[in-house]
C-alpha cells in the first residue's frame, strides 16, 4: 500500500527512472515515472506533489513547469551533468542552470565531490541497483570465458571521457587478455578496432547484464568525469574484481539496496515537507 505525497520520477537513459520509481513504490511511496522529458505533461504534474528529476540537463523543463505549478521539486545529480554545469562555456546557459537549481527544494548527489562542482548544498544519495539479482548471479556456476569488461560508449566526447585510448593501449600491452568493450542503449559502442583480443558489444539489455558480468573476471572503469557508476557495484555483487580509475573497489554503499535508498529518500523528503 502506498501513502504520503505522490512522486513523479522524471528521467531518460541511465539511471532508469522506472527502477527508481519501483524502489520507492516497494517502500510504500506513491510513485510513478516518465522518460518523456522534452515536453512536460502539465496533466501528470498536476496529479502529483513532488517532481523528482534525474540528470539536470534532461529534467530541467519538468522542474521549471512543476515549480510554476507550486510543486515540490528535486534534482538528482548523476555525475556528467555536474561536470556539464561546471564547464558550461555559455554565460546565459550558466544562468539558466543556476535558475533551475534555485527552483529546487532539494538536491541529491551520487557522490560528495559533485556537490563541490555544482556549488549548491545537497544530500549524498547513491542510486539503487537490483542487488538481489546480481548476488544471485554470483552464485551461478558460470565460468568466465573473458578477462576484462570495459565501458566506453561511442562518440567523440565519450571516447575522451571514458578513455578509449587507455583501453586500446592496455589491449596492445596485454595481447593474451580477452577484452570486451560495451556501451549503452542510448550511446552504443560502435568501434572498429583492429585488435584481435578485443570484442565490441554495442550494448545489452539491462536484464542481460548479470550474464555479461559473469563472462568476465574483471571490470575496469576509467573516466575523467567520475560520478558513482552503478556498473562498479553491480560487478562487485556478481563476484568480479573491479578497478575504478586505477584503484580497486570492494565495498558497496548501503543505499544501493533499494530499501535503503527509499528510506533515505523518504527521510530527506520529510525534512522539507
Residue ranges and their predicted role:
Residues 50, 66-85:
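Active-site proximal beta-strand in glycosyltransferases
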Residues 53-59, 77:
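Short His-centered aromatic/hydrophobic patch
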Residues 80, 89-106:
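Membrane-proximal helix-turn-helix segments that form the acceptor-binding/catalytic region
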Residues 101-124, 186-189:
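A short, active-site helix/loop in glycosyltransferases that binds the activated sugar's phosphate group
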Residues 129-145, 190-192:
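Acidic anion/phosphate-binding donor-loop and adjacent secondary structure
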Residues 140-162, 168-174, 179-182:
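Conserved donor-binding/catalytic core segment of Leloir-type glycosyltransferases
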Residues 188-207:
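Nucleotide-activated donor-binding/catalytic signature segment of Leloir-type glycosyltransferases, i.e.
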Residues 224:
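Aromatic "clamp/platform" in nucleotide-sugar-dependent glycosyltransferases that forms part
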